Swiss-Prot record:
Gene: metXA
UniProt-listed GO biological process terms: homoserine metabolic process; methionine biosynthetic process
Reported function: Transfers an acetyl group from acetyl-CoA to L-homoserine, forming acetyl-L-homoserine.
Taxonomic superkingdom: Archaea
Protein name: Homoserine O-acetyltransferase
Organism: Haloferax prahovense (strain DSM 18310 / JCM 13924 / TL6)
Assembly and interaction partners: Homodimer.
Length: 415
């Protein structure tokens, strides 16, 4: 159902669009792919900005004033960045965010109704980042949006943004990739694999067939997967600052997961309480099968797939690019962004790699808007010449050999 809200300084569209038959990269065809989106501001024909959400995010990127968003995400996930007078100023830009296929916030996915009237479950076609991009392109066609002023993405949304430069290079003027990379490294692939195993090992997963009011859902497995995710998103320093070794009162949450026999003797620590809380909240709002599908899509993405190199994949893109990385992010490191910047430079794409000093880990792109907003907003407005945009390459070419980043811990378990 389409909804349009207009308040002073705000115009918000929220809708689910049936874009018709859609062939996935796997070759499987969905007869009626439904795509959910939200859009903010007024479209003037040349001011459209597409924001690509993170792994378990949704189309609810900005606040509505009333803050009534999609299920379980009443709070906008980037509300400090998108909105009137903010970095992505909806007084100037028509900002669109699309829930990707395979997710569970209105776009078709495993929890959606299939042709037989039952949820698809694991019969839903496998999805890739390329599928996300093509679905977004079709949704934008439906909205009458052609060339995009900018595509912006954070985390796996940054991979989605990069894919726009490969699949639709003529449709993007400016590309902003925040806390992302050209591909996952083997450590992150391994952690994602364990997270999926946690879900599929839960007896309630039942091969992906757990839908229905009278069915138990694999909340324990999904919760464990989310806990692994949160350990990836935080840095050693931020965890030490937030939790240290402090004990917490067990209350109800201390019994959220089965305890080992000696648990009563040892303290229930604040870090455990935090992880248990995040697990409980996540299981209330997200679908376990969607988590399996979306992590597979992220793991599978490789910018250079089908090309000789990352640079070759980006060669057709003639716009400008901003890469934002964070010194405390070991999920997507500054080194990975610098490598990506080098790929852009090798094909003469104007690029700036803006490094943010932060110890907040991967979450920095969400929790430090005061550091992300200025370079992002200036880039979208003015390109790489934007006032707040900095670059690791001191002369606009190859990076200075003396350039040194703050240390990034490569392993969660060695810190």
């Amino acid at each position: 159902m389409s909804r349009t809200r207009t308040t002073p300084g705000r115009r918000v569209e929220s809708d689910v669009v049936d874009i018709g038959e859609h062939e996935f990269e796997s070759g499987e065809i969905l007869p009626d792919l439904k795509v959910a989106y939200e859009a903010y501001g007024e479209f003037d024909g040349q001011n459209a900005v597409l924001v690509c959400h993170g792994l378990t995010g949704s189309q609810h990127v900005a606040g509505h004033g009333t803050e009534s968003g999609v299920s379980g995400q009443a709070r906008a996930w980037w509300g400090d960045i998108v909105g009137p007078g903010k970095a992505l100023d909806t007084n100037d830009y028509y900002v669109i965010c699309v829930n990707v296929p395979g997710s569970c916030y209105g776009t078709s996915g495993p929890a959606s109704e299939g042709p037989d009237g039952e949820p698809w479950g694991t019969d839903f076609p496998p999805v890739t980042v390329h599928d996300w991009t093509r679905a977004q392109r079709r949704l934008l066609d439906h909205l009458g949006v052609g060339r995009l002023h900018a595509v912006v993405g954070g985390s796996v949304g940054g991979m989605n943004a990069l894919d726009w430069a490969v699949q639709f290079p003529d449709d993007v003027e400016r590309l902003a990739v925040v806390a992302s990379a050209a591909r996952l490294d083997s450590q992150c692939l391994g952690i994602d694999a364990v997270a999926r195993r946690a879900i599929t090992s839960d007896p309630n997963w039942n091969g992906g067939d757990y839908y229905g009011e009278d069915r138990a859902t694999p909340d324990a497995g999904l919760g464990l997967a989310r806990q692994l995710g949160h350990l990836m998103y935080l840095s050693k320093d931020s965890m030490e600052r937030k939790f240290g070794r402090r004990s917490a009162g067990r209350g109800d949450r201390g019994d959220a997961f089965p305890s080992d026999p000696a648990a009563a003797f040892f303290p229930y620590r604040e870090v455990e309480s935090y992880l248990d809380y995040q697990a409980e909240k996540f299981a209330e709002r997200f679908d376990a099968n969607s988590y399996l599908y979306l992590t597979r899509a992220m793991d599978d993405f490789d910018l250079s797939e089908g090309y000789e190199s990352d640079a070759a994949a980006l060669a057709a893109f003639e716009g400008e690019s901003l890469l934002v990385s964070f010194t405390g992010d070991w999920h997507f490191t500054t080194e990975q962004s610098e490598s990506l910047a080098g790929a852009f430079r090798r094909v003469d794409v104007p690029v700036a790699h803006h490094v943010v000093e932060s110890d907040h880990g991967h979450d920095a792109f969400l929790v430090e808007p005061e550091k992300v907003g200025p370079p992002l907003g200036d880039f979208v407005d003015e390109g790489v010449a934007g006032r707040a945009v900095t670059d690791t390459a001191t002369d606009g070419g190859e990076p200075d050999e003396e350039e040194d980043f703050a240390p990034v811990h490569s392993s969660l378990f060695s810190r």
